[in-house]
């Protein structure tokens, strides 16, 4: 029989294969020159199919291109001249066009073990990219599996212009295949990296090679691993432009072929992929080629039941009619839907979702047939190979995406660029977890879980990883530093065991609180090590706060209690309130399981603490503004003001920390930066607060310091200046020195600080003592009494020559009275309203007033003469410088009866003039004074002169008493108009 045109077509097609780039480069993953690309093919025996036509077997040996063409005489073929000699060039890679393979030869499933590697075009690396040098050496080193002849299935994808190769080696017992490997097949075998288990001869009855033209998404489920039951679905996802029909074959249908994507990583064993099964011939109906004009087009129907082959066995297993591909004009406008093929009688398996891949909506997500699916699974081939570890998908710039890409993940450093490997674990009888959809992935940032759900728990390890060395520094630093206020309080107790009780109580409270806080931080800080338990940790955490607060109240009551109302000054009231405070906190922490009750108790505790702190600040302000600013109070108001401010801040932070202390039932406390900030500053405030209270307790319990240091006083005056209108030093007499008794200014007693004159046993001034005698010698007569002769009295200086400057400090008024007028002229003092000595009832205006220049008009009363007796020695020595005034010589009527008969009885108390500052003109002596300022002297004892009878008789009575005291020739000065001091 003459050779048919179909044989010529097959021969020409096989001759064009080396020119189309189907050589060894297909198994390598990188482009190679098309001129040197060849692929050997080995024929085999094939049984007849059930469709009515024999399977097409192509013998592609160059020696006999059409040896078996007579077997295909009953099949229509296209003439050779109508077949395209060379496909249309495409930037994505070459494409093959040819007749469809017979379906009858593929009824039995064949395990496919080679990994698909898509051939790359000369201008694009596509999905895989070039191989590394290390990968190239490893692939060259792998020896081919010594099993039968390779079966190459060429699966050209028309839109991508790429050729996908699947190597199907038969088993060792295959008897229908004969022949030897050609020499050029050794290169292909060296590049084949797949190994398959032995299969029976009945498992391999397909053609040695099959040319299938398809379009659309290409998927294949494979089994990988070494000994597990995981199924790895590797998918080469096509974009929307992948569904474009080739102009040379506009009516080509969509056939889901089988592919394996394989990537060899250096240092790792190659992935072993085993195909589940190849669809039998009944499932892939083929229409006969139709002749349309001068072109030959091969149409392949969709997996749905065609009208001519409605009696296929797997048609009834399909859930419904499968849609066919859209026409070529509509294909580029919308993406193609993934096809569902019934494989080995099982329920169709949808492709595994790949991040960033194109998938039409409505694709079923289930990868495992449900229990109600009727499809049988008789020839399912599952090799017991372990599952490999899943690799992360790697993003690339040119990847087609229909939804926002997933966050980039780190891929292995040796993985190929552009490769997608999807691994799913298949558990028998359990559906996999639902995959996230595009909408959920897009809304993930907006609906992200709160920070508490993902934050690390409050445990030592996570806190140390998050905070690094700050965590240990905080824990151990605070635990050790709290020992310092404890030591200060212990020192206060040891130094003054007999001090004030409130100060000792405050020291004990500070000692206990500091010890508890230090123990809590060093044993189980914030419950991170779970050593104390929940209840024990709460007790140690909350108890120091009421202790420090009670210590502050005790010190305030001790130092500033005077400003409180009397009912609040009772220490027993403070003790009762402190006891209720501490016991309430302990009871709620140990017994309550309701977090709301614990928070309420903490709120009341912090409110009481804030009230005590504010009261302390108010009392300190009142004391600093009203009272003196010395360190006489213990403890001082300034130190208590600092402690009150720290207590107020600590009360607020204690309430904020309670929000994390009681997270609620079933909730675990988790780390947050707000938690860290609150607890960090709260520990620092507690430490400073305890130090201030310990210092205040030491200041209250220690002995009182003698004086204030001058340098420290200056610093305090600079730091706290006195308010305007207030004097730093109170106004006190210059000779009054307040002792340490701190008496008030109104209760000053200056009698103790006065310098008293010596007793009246002082001697008279003698010439040997000099003219500048002491002021104490004035007014002190001799002890001999009136019988003292005049010879014993020496000359004395005048009042202007006397040294009346007293030693300092001295009360000047009392010194003047004691020096001039003691028991002489006035009763008590010249500066006070008093009568003369000896008067039973002094007249109302009889008091001597110290006014200057007073005119001598006052009359001498009855007792006036008795004042000037011989006992006055200081005034009797005054020299007479002028005539005696008339008012002194003439005594008025009514006064003579009470006179003592002395010439001194005529002395007038109104004639005394006192000049307080005799040297105010800057003059050096008395003689240089102005005339009006010169002191006028009086002759107290004038010489006897003839006078009227009454006067003479009166003077005679008086001279009888005075004459024995001295000679008549001696003049004595009784007084002067002006006494200069």
From Swiss-Prot:
<keyword id="KW-1133">Transmembrane helix</keyword>
<feature type="transmembrane region" description="Helical">
    <location>
        <begin position="639"/>
        <end position="659"/>
    </location>
</feature>
<feature type="region of interest" description="Disordered">
    <location>
        <begin position="937"/>
        <end position="981"/>
    </location>
</feature>
<feature type="region of interest" description="Disordered">
    <location>
        <begin position="759"/>
        <end position="807"/>
    </location>
</feature>
<feature type="signal peptide">
    <location>
        <begin position="1"/>
        <end position="27"/>
    </location>
</feature>
<feature type="compositionally biased region" description="Polar residues">
    <location>
        <begin position="411"/>
        <end position="427"/>
    </location>
</feature>
<feature type="transmembrane region" description="Helical">
    <location>
        <begin position="571"/>
        <end position="591"/>
    </location>
</feature>
<feature type="modified residue" description="Phosphoserine">
    <location>
        <position position="798"/>
    </location>
</feature>
<feature type="modified residue" description="Phosphoserine">
    <location>
        <position position="777"/>
    </location>
</feature>
<keyword id="KW-0325">Glycoprotein</keyword>
<feature type="modified residue" description="Phosphoserine">
    <location>
        <position position="789"/>
    </location>
</feature>
<keyword id="KW-0488">Methylation</keyword>
<dbReference type="GO" id="GO:0016020">
    <property type="term" value="C:membrane"/>
</dbReference>
<feature type="modified residue" description="Phosphoserine">
    <location>
        <position position="874"/>
    </location>
</feature>
<keyword id="KW-0472">Membrane</keyword>
<feature type="transmembrane region" description="Helical">
    <location>
        <begin position="475"/>
        <end position="495"/>
    </location>
</feature>
<feature type="topological domain" description="Cytoplasmic">
    <location>
        <begin position="620"/>
        <end position="638"/>
    </location>
</feature>
<feature type="region of interest" description="Disordered">
    <location>
        <begin position="43"/>
        <end position="107"/>
    </location>
</feature>
<feature type="region of interest" description="Disordered">
    <location>
        <begin position="169"/>
        <end position="457"/>
    </location>
</feature>
<feature type="modified residue" description="Omega-N-methylarginine">
    <location>
        <position position="780"/>
    </location>
</feature>
<feature type="modified residue" description="Phosphoserine">
    <location>
        <position position="903"/>
    </location>
</feature>
<feature type="topological domain" description="Extracellular">
    <location>
        <begin position="660"/>
        <end position="679"/>
    </location>
</feature>
<feature type="compositionally biased region" description="Basic and acidic residues">
    <location>
        <begin position="65"/>
        <end position="85"/>
    </location>
</feature>
<feature type="topological domain" description="Extracellular">
    <location>
        <begin position="523"/>
        <end position="542"/>
    </location>
</feature>
<feature type="topological domain" description="Cytoplasmic">
    <location>
        <begin position="564"/>
        <end position="570"/>
    </location>
</feature>
<feature type="topological domain" description="Extracellular">
    <location>
        <begin position="592"/>
        <end position="598"/>
    </location>
</feature>
<dbReference type="InterPro" id="IPR043242">
    <property type="entry name" value="PRRT3"/>
</dbReference>
<feature type="compositionally biased region" description="Basic and acidic residues">
    <location>
        <begin position="331"/>
        <end position="340"/>
    </location>
</feature>
<feature type="modified residue" description="Phosphoserine">
    <location>
        <position position="911"/>
    </location>
</feature>
<feature type="glycosylation site" description="O-linked (GalNAc...) serine">
    <location>
        <position position="329"/>
    </location>
</feature>
<feature type="topological domain" description="Cytoplasmic">
    <location>
        <begin position="701"/>
        <end position="981"/>
    </location>
</feature>
<feature type="region of interest" description="O-glycosylated at one site">
    <location>
        <begin position="297"/>
        <end position="302"/>
    </location>
</feature>
<feature type="transmembrane region" description="Helical">
    <location>
        <begin position="599"/>
        <end position="619"/>
    </location>
</feature>
<feature type="compositionally biased region" description="Low complexity">
    <location>
        <begin position="437"/>
        <end position="457"/>
    </location>
</feature>
<feature type="transmembrane region" description="Helical">
    <location>
        <begin position="502"/>
        <end position="522"/>
    </location>
</feature>
<feature type="transmembrane region" description="Helical">
    <location>
        <begin position="543"/>
        <end position="563"/>
    </location>
</feature>
<feature type="compositionally biased region" description="Low complexity">
    <location>
        <begin position="765"/>
        <end position="780"/>
    </location>
</feature>
<feature type="topological domain" description="Extracellular">
    <location>
        <begin position="28"/>
        <end position="474"/>
    </location>
</feature>
<feature type="compositionally biased region" description="Polar residues">
    <location>
        <begin position="972"/>
        <end position="981"/>
    </location>
</feature>
<feature type="modified residue" description="Phosphoserine">
    <location>
        <position position="808"/>
    </location>
</feature>
<keyword id="KW-0732">Signal</keyword>
<keyword id="KW-0597">Phosphoprotein</keyword>
